[in-house]
């Protein structure tokens, strides 16, 4: 076994206090996202998306957040992918934004709802053409005999759609994650980290401090 126990550091970038928190977690998320972008973090919109299969086995993967508002968080994917198949059977989902250089994490739990075709199309047409073509090429999560198969399919579809617009594939869509809870974590000195969790209620949001 490889021992990694001596890899550690102190967290020194500041704390988080209840008096600083807005009543709406999405306002704090927006503030933190803007700070992550301003700090020029690599892929500040990257989030770890966790879903569960029918046997209760969790799966995780990195996906890019494409939009957020007071309703929740939006991402897009192939509807034949493992994550989409699992969400069809169990819509419970969790998201994690790991902003390590800022010593911050945001963890979300909630329910994933499929987006309408109109909402998906509105985003799809903004993608670069090669990305639109790639959506047609990859049967996400299926097994491939070789990378050359994928590349050949891409060139075939690129030729097919060379003259005009790329249509939205019927098997490509997106989800709105409606949050049930959002936890904000800020690293603290001596491992006394600051954690606050917002939990959705009928009246709005409850806010509680959690032990680190």
UniProtKB/Swiss-Prot annotation:
This is Pyridoxine/pyridoxamine 5'-phosphate oxidase. FMN binds at residues 61-66, 76-77, 82-83, 105, 140-141, 185, 195. Pathway: Cofactor metabolism; pyridoxal 5'-phosphate salvage; pyridoxal 5'-phosphate from pyridoxamine 5'-phosphate: step 1/1; Cofactor metabolism; pyridoxal 5'-phosphate salvage; pyridoxal 5'-phosphate from pyridoxine 5'-phosphate: step 1/1. It holds the Pfam family PNPOx_N. Keywords: Flavoprotein, FMN, Oxidoreductase, Pyridoxine biosynthesis. InterPro entries: Pyridox_Oxase, Pyridox_Oxase_CS, Pyridox_Oxase_N, Pyridoxamine_oxidase_dimer_C, Split_barrel_FMN-bd. It comes from Shewanella amazonensis (strain ATCC BAA-1098 / SB2B). One of its GO terms (biological process) is pyridoxine biosynthetic process. Catalyzes the oxidation of either pyridoxine 5'-phosphate (PNP) or pyridoxamine 5'-phosphate (PMP) into pyridoxal 5'-phosphate (PLP). Binds 1 FMN per subunit. Belongs to the pyridoxamine 5'-phosphate oxidase family. Substrate binds at residues 8-11, 66, 123, 127, 131, 191-193. Its cofactor is FMN. It catalyses: pyridoxamine 5'-phosphate + O2 + H2O = pyridoxal 5'-phosphate + H2O2 + NH4(+); pyridoxine 5'-phosphate + O2 = pyridoxal 5'-phosphate + H2O2. Homodimer. The keyword Membrane does not apply. One of its GO terms (molecular function) is FMN binding. Gene3D superfamilies: Electron Transport, Fmn-binding Protein, Chain A (2.30.110.10). Its EC number is 1.4.3.5.
């Amino acid at each position: 076994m490889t021992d990694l126990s001596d890899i550690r550091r102190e967290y020194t970038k500041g704390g988080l206090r209840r008096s600083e928190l807005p009543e709406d977690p999405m306002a704090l998320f927006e503030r933190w996202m803007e700070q992550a972008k301003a700090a020029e973090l690599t892929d500040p919109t990257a989030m770890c998306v966790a879903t569960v299969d029918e046997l209760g086995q969790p799966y995780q993967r990195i996906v890019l957040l494409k939009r957020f508002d007071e309703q929740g968080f939006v991402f897009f994917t192939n509807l034949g992918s493992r994550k989409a198949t699992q969400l069809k059977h169990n819509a419970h989902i969790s998201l994690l934004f790991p902003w390590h250089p800022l010593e911050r994490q945001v963890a979300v739990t909630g329910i994933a709802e499929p987006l309408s075709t109109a909402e998906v199309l509105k985003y799809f047409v903004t993608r670069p053409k090669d990305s639109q073509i790639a959506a047609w090429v990859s049967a996400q999560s299926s097994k491939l005999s070789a990378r050359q198969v994928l590349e050949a399919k891409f060139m075939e579809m690129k030729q097919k759609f060379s003259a005009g617009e790329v249509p939205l594939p019927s098997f490509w869509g997106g989800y709105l994650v409606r949050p049930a809870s959002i936890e904000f974590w800020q690293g603290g000195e001596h491992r006394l980290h600051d954690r606050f969790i917002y939990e959705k209620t009928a009246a709005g949001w409850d806010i509680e401090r959690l032990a680190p």
